[in-house]
Amino acid sequence: MTKEQLGVLILDCERQLYSTAKTILYSDQDCADAIQDTIVKAFSKIQTLKNDNYARTWLIRILINECYTILRKSSKLTSLDMMDEQTKAEKIMMTKEKADYSELYQAINALKEEVRLPVILYYIEDFNIREIAQILDITEGAVQKRLARARGKLRCNLRESEAAI
């Protein structure tokens, strides 16, 4: 794959990159940082891509790793005082953002990351089971189990919220 082809792929996957980063990081600034780091790393490591057919999967895997790197760094840097202030600010922002989200999207975001990420990749980003397994470095059976677990949890949560109304 050439650098020009990678550039086109990145532009085509822009929305997917953002929504995948958002499922892990939540903060728009952190998402932008992760995407930027992903693009830099992808261009610098393009020679490690063995099969052009898996370029999108490879790019998403790099993004997920970058998101986890940001999470690790931020957990080391945040002091307790800053965490209290940050938590308050995030709660206010999340409340405003959640008002814009549909009930289903809120239910998806409430899932544990282990099952949320496969749901986003499968139902929103249109990755197939095999690609998700490669991205998350798990078996296809594990992806299917996580999707089934997520569907069950979503079904239960949405029924509970309907009953509350």
Functional labels for PLM-detected ranges:
Residues 118-122:
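A short pre-motif secondary-structure segment
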Residues 27, 128, 137-142:
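Helix-turn-helix DNA-binding motif, specifically the short coil turn and the N-cap/start of the second
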Residues 1-19, 35:
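A short, charge-rich alpha-helical start-of-domain segment used by transcription regulators
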Residues 69, 76-109, 128:
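Internal acidic/polar
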Residues 14, 22, 39-43, 53-76:
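Σ70-family region 2.3-2.4 aromatic/basic alpha-helix that recognizes the −10 promoter
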Residues 4-8, 77-81, 134-137, 151-165:
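C-terminal edge and immediately downstream basic/flexible tail or linker adjoining helix-turn-helix-like DNA-binding
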Residues 13, 34, 146-149, 153:
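Residues within the DNA-recognition helix of helix-turn-helix
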Residues 18, 28-45:
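Conserved RNAP core-binding helix
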